[in-house]
Amino acid sequence: MPYLASTTPPPSTLVDAALPRGLRDRTAGMSWEAVLAAHGPTVGPLRLSGWKSSEPRHQGRRPWLGHRKFQATLAIGDLICNASVAAGGPVAALTEMLYEHGFPVEMLEFHQRDAGTQTVTFVHGSNGLRDEWAVGWDSDATQSALRAVVACANRVCA
C-alpha cells in the first residue's frame, strides 16, 4: 500500500489537540482543514510501499539496542527502486533510504499523538535549504511516522 496519502480520514479527535509549537506558530488562525491542506499528505514524486523490518538483534539484557534491517520499495516518479538498510529504527532507516535515492531530508522535530483509533505524527524536516512541517496518520504508529516522513520529503525536495 503506498504511503502517498492516508487511507482513512484525518482523526477528528485531533482538532482539539495542541499542535507542536513550531507548527502552531506557522498555522496560527488556520482551520484544521487548512492545516491539513498545507501540511498533510500530498501528491509528490516520492511514494513508499512494501515496508518490512527484521527483529532487533539482542545484545545482552538490552534487546532494544542494535540495528534492524529495513526493506522498502520506493517509487520516484515512474522509477521503482528497492532499498535496504540497517538502522536503529524506522525513521532513521527511511531517511537513510531517501538520502541514498536523492531525497536528503533530516528530521528536526518529531511528535506523535494518539487520536482515537489513529496515531498522528508531526515531523519538521529540512534538506539544508528549506524546512517544512508535515503530518501523517494511521492506525499503526510506525506507519503514521512513515507517512509523515514521506510527506515531508515531498515538501522539502519539491
Mark where each language-model region is.
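Mixed-charge, glycine-accented linear interaction segment located at domain edges/termini
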Residues: 124-158
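Terminal or standalone catalytic/regulatory effector modules within metabolic enzymes
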Residues: 2-127
